[in-house]
From Swiss-Prot:
Keywords: ATP-binding, Kinase, Magnesium, Metal-binding, Nucleotide metabolism, Nucleotide-binding, Phosphoprotein, Transferase. Pfam families: NDK (PF00334). It comes from the Eukaryota. Major role in the synthesis of nucleoside triphosphates other than ATP. The ATP gamma phosphate is transferred to the NDP beta phosphate via a ping-pong mechanism, using a phosphorylated active-site intermediate. This is Nucleoside diphosphate kinase 1. The active site is at H116. One of its GO terms (biological process) is GTP biosynthetic process. ATP binds at K10, F58, R86, T92, R103, N113. Its cofactor is Mg(2+).
Length: 149
């Protein structure tokens, strides 16, 4: 099985109409969408998702931001999707993101940086289990043999 990652388009990305653009970038790279849902997150769920950041001074503002509007939660699958997905997304601080990355092209402030992506396989597995307790879709891309050796 290929690696999986969790990607979330944050409320600013949803409100700005960037869903299609973001999905397109992952699809064009050759990754396969295995789960997708548009959800409005409540405070306890957001706090659980960001529990590892609970001691940070920005935690409360981050939770307020995530619950401020709908988000798009996704599971993406492919070879090295966690590492490559982070490269597609760009640095957490948009000012340090290269042009051509999602944050480099669409974000200005670190507090409104459009997208979240798992930072490691372990956190991806944890986030996927939290957001998709039903698991990913049981399907395989027909393009798989055209992308991978």
């Amino acid at each position: 099985m290929d690696e999986q990652t969790f990607i979330m388009i944050k409320p600013d990305g949803v409100q700005r109409g960037l869903i299609g653009e973001i999905i397109s970038r992952f699809e064009k790279k050759g990754f396969y969408l295995k789960g997708l849902k548009l959800v409005t997150v409540d405070r306890p769920f957001a706090e659980k998702h960001y529990a590892d950041l609970s001691a940070k001074p920005f935690f409360s503002g981050l939770v307020d931001y995530i619950i401020s509007g709908p988000v798009v939660a996704m599971i993406w699958e492919g070879k090295n999707v966690v590492t490559t997905g982070r490269k597609i997304i760009g640095a957490t601080n948009p000012a340090q993101s290269e042009p051509g990355t999602i944050r480099g092209d669409f974000a200005i402030d670190i507090g409104r940086n459009v997208i979240h992506g798992s930072d490691a396989v372990e956190s991806a597995n944890k986030e996927i289990a939290l957001w998709f307790p039903e698991g990913p879709a049981n399907c395989q891309s027909s393009q798989h043999s055209w992308i991978y050796e």
